[in-house]
């Protein structure tokens, strides 16, 4: 399926919010090698090309193995700053106006990197991005679900001196054997602290994990959530309660969650009234940032301009933004879609 040229242009230019991107997953091979040289880290790959070739993983676990290996080059505030600025430049080029960025402190503290180094480096880059690019952003601290809840508690407590730097907590890494209820107490603690709550659920795990994330963890947003399609009552609930799903199509394709994008359920869920949003997840590893995900999705599924407007709107509606700023972004989206033609203008007759 090909996209109409005018619609393709519009989905590239529409204002967007990115709500599901792991900052460590934006590490391109070139930057990994540059940081490895700067920090004298030996990589098990002889070249950038060899590292890129290793990105031929086939499932979530094989991806996570190389993901954590790539993160090993991140040691200083400057490293985290450079990684974040590289992402921001790509996001700005894709007309991302606001991003809520995941970071995994346990990946770094386990290697002896202080949590302050992680948060300061990322935060400094985002502060510069706000000034330099008018790029709105916030941070979400993610717990690694293959580790213990005690480790998550320790991470949350260690992050509290930086409480003003992040707006919420999330839950990522492998779902297998790590159900939402494993982290019930730490999510209760985060809620008491006034933090927003999100969680990965229903990617490789069942639809029941989505329900459990809502009922046990009390999350406000579901990351991935594509297995929700297996439960009609859950789909009705998501639509009724306006619970957003942060869907990552190229990630789903690469990890074989949905190998054929033409069979991806996001269009069916969108038509059912679910607040679907599109994001890049770990774009350096999955072959595409925001616009690549939008373009691949529209090429694979029967989506039109009204769907694109809805997807862009959903991304800002689901964002953890102050009401006035959210209203401004929504007005920007609505103006874009009402003011820009969705098909090429007719050619004027010759005089």
From Swiss-Prot:
Binding-site residues for Zn(2+), renumbered to this chain: 20, 22, 200, 281
Chain ranges passing through the membrane: none
EC number: 3.5.4.2
Keywords: Hydrolase, Metal-binding, Nucleotide metabolism, Zinc
Family matches, as SUPFAM superfamilies: Metallo-dependent hydrolases
Entry keyword annotation includes Zinc: yes
Cofactor: Zn(2+)
GO cellular component: cytosol
Classification via InterPro entries: A_deaminase_dom, ADE, Ado/ade_deaminase, Metal_Hydrolase
Pfam families cross-referenced by the UniProt entry: A_deaminase (PF00962)
GO molecular function: adenine deaminase activity; zinc ion binding
GO biological process: adenine catabolic process; hypoxanthine salvage; nucleotide metabolic process
Positions bound to substrate: 282
Catalytic activity: adenine + H2O + H(+) = hypoxanthine + NH4(+)
Enzyme class at the top of the EC tree: hydrolase
Active site as annotated: 203
Sites marked Important for catalytic activity: 224
Entry's cofactor comment: Binds 1 zinc ion per subunit.
Statement: the UniProt record of this protein carries the keyword Transmembrane helix: no
Function: Catalyzes the hydrolytic deamination of adenine to hypoxanthine. Plays an important role in the purine salvage pathway and in nitrogen catabolism.
Membership in a protein family: Belongs to the metallo-dependent hydrolases superfamily. Adenosine and AMP deaminases family. Adenine deaminase type 2 subfamily.
Protein name from the UniProt record: Adenine deaminase
The species this protein was found in: Cupriavidus pinatubonensis (strain JMP 134 / LMG 1197) (Cupriavidus necator (strain JMP 134))
